[in-house]
């Protein structure tokens, strides 16, 4: 399969060269190229059918290949190859499993001590079974609302670091906030603190070499996650590390929606105010966040750091703060962990489901769960951005609005600035904060990490944040929304058609 893909890429290159030298060859060899492309397309269509993907994905791929053979062929090479994905991440999955079996303690005892309703307990058992990380009762959490509050807390904790600082980010910029982070990390490295920084090679592709080299010269280990040497000839532009993790001395951790960049402080002229949510964690649950980082670090460097100095019991926090569970999702896992936990949260609801997601492109399972909940009389609300970030995703999201509105889902468009929070609150008792959007990319392609909260004070804070956000949002009226121009509907429909491919 891998060799076939490389041969197919060679066919494309030859075709381009033949096109550029058309006058010289007289077009004689273009017929051969057309036959090769046609055979490749037929072969790919056959492979897609045998992979037993979801019907929506299969139909979308076959439609694109049939309508635009050449473009569809290229698109498949970049985004569609499941076989190479599975083979590529098999080794990571095996090493992750070995670490978990050695270092994770059983979770059912903690689950039984949580004061949860009987209908909610299956969610915890599911999370432990497919997520493989325990629920912690000896942890404290604090919701950090927006950039100023988040970065203030991060820098305050970084200054206190004595042994190690571990960072993992999708986007890192060398702007004002990025420079501030660089100077703090260089200072801590000079003090003898071990600083390890894993950044995504695609998300941070604009990060300057000078920035990286300055940190390395100061003793900071800067490692790119899954570098892409030939982005147009490799589907490595998918399967990105979308996680945002900081672990300090094994006892303090951060996770959430904010990357490292000035736009997250509202300094971008287009976006303006940036609405986001992050989470500060202290205590036992940080150990899980540490494990997730160390697994990713080992995958990229081959360096095992599974020693007591990194995995010893963290700061003692008394029980009684509710439960905290860190769950990692990614293409290296057998189950669609984040999606299945979202689904379980939605179907466990008795009173309310409030969702904030900047990129809302659900699959049929999540879409049906939301509609059924609303039709059952549950208060289902979706908070989405009114200002587009990625236009194709924005229009694809809006294509789902009519059927959701018709089912009784209340949809609000955030108007104060750009909404980037990735939060779910169910019945005011269960919540999720993290890096995963409610879209197919987060469900199937990206490496993500979410914190699931059970009966914590932080959940109450999230409810209050939602109420404040609704004040700065406008509800969408179903009748008025149906009157949008026909050309807009076409764009939405095409974007939605492409969404299973992206």
From Swiss-Prot:
What are its E.C. numbers? Answer: 2.7.8.-
Instruction: Name the top EC class.
Output: transferase
Entry's localization field: Cell membrane
Q: Would the keyword Flavoprotein be found if you checked this record's keyword annotation?
A: no
Any single GO molecular-function term of the entry would be: cardiolipin synthase activity
Keyword line: Cell membrane, Lipid biosynthesis, Lipid metabolism, Membrane, Phospholipid biosynthesis, Phospholipid metabolism, Repeat, Transferase, Transmembrane, Transmembrane helix
**A Pfam family hit:** PLDc_N
What InterPro entries does UniProt report for this protein, alphabetically?
Answer: Cardiolipin_synth_Firmi (IPR030874), Cardiolipin_synthase (IPR022924), CLS_N (IPR027379), PLD-like_dom (IPR025202), PLipase_D/transphosphatidylase (IPR001736)
Catalyses which reaction(s): 2 a 1,2-diacyl-sn-glycero-3-phospho-(1'-sn-glycerol) = a cardiolipin + glycerol
Record-annotated active site: 242, 244, 249, 420, 422, 427
Q: Which residues are listed as membrane-spanning?
A: 7-27, 29-49, 59-79
Bilayer disposition of the protein: Multi-pass membrane protein
Please name the GO terms of the biological process aspect recorded for this protein, alphabetically.
cardiolipin biosynthetic process
> Which GO CC annotations does the UniProt entry carry?
plasma membrane
Residue ranges of domain PLD phosphodiesterase in the record = 237-264, 415-442
User: What NCBIfam families does the record point to?
Assistant: bac_cardiolipin
Family of the protein in this entry: Belongs to the phospholipase D family. Cardiolipin synthase subfamily.
**Cross-referenced PANTHER family, in alphabetical order?**
CARDIOLIPIN SYNTHASE, CARDIOLIPIN SYNTHASE YWIE-RELATED
Physiological role:
Catalyzes the reversible phosphatidyl group transfer from one phosphatidylglycerol molecule to another to form cardiolipin (CL) (diphosphatidylglycerol) and glycerol.
What is this protein's name? Cardiolipin synthase
Gene coding for it: cls
